[in-house]
Amino acid sequence: VGPPAPEELKLLEPFRGQVPDDVFGEPYMPPVSDGSGQDRALLRKAVQLLNDAGYIVKDGKRLLPNGEPFKLEFLVDEPSLQPHHAPYIKNLGTLGIEASLRVVDPVQYRARVEDFDFDMTIERFSMSATPGDGMRPFFSSQSAATKGSYNLAGIASPAIDALIEKIIGADNRADLTVACRAFDRVFRAGRYWVPQWYRTTHPIAYWDQFGHPAKPPRYAQGVGAPENWWSDPNKAAKAEQAK
């Protein structure tokens, strides 16, 4: 929160004019709706932003600056994802944007995604608790030009490339934190991803034969942090009897 600290500014200043101005002020925060699915205040703001950018409405249809209709296709491989997209598509329609959902089989989906042949799609990515060279496949300019990479948004930013290298080359935790915060400001200001939905719980099934820490590590990996479980002999004996 707040403007960049002096240490962050040192990393960001070389890219002033190449990144959005809000990188140097309060960090960008995605809008928060009223939860109704049709937040009129946000829709009015969206209309204003589109109009200001030259995306006008004619005969009820939103047009691109070149006069062509504004069309947007969401590509998914699971019919079960349709309810998650329906409110988004409905609101885009309210704005005059011709949005649609295309469900394809997993093979075709994977082929199209790896070839970057889509307008928008949904993905869930897991990141390391300590950022490092694993960021390149997701955010670097090189990965944007590599078919099959995780950089589905096609992020190609010299500023992001440089900050990734600062993160990888950090000599200590303090420098790593500064570089990550600078990266976060640039990434968020780019509006590359749209947060969509999440589940507050993940159901898993297992025999009651394990011990668990009273408080799981904050950034533990995996559902329920199974790498922090241990076999409890007493529980295991009871579970074996129940099998």
How should these model regions be labeled?
Residues 1-30, 44-47, 79-90, 110-243:
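Detector for C-terminal structural segments
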Residues 34-35:
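The substrate-binding groove and active-site-proximal loops of carbohydrate-active enzymes
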Residues 68-78, 99-102, 119:
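Short, well-ordered beta-strand elements
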Residues 88-99:
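Short alpha-helix C-terminal cap/hinge motif
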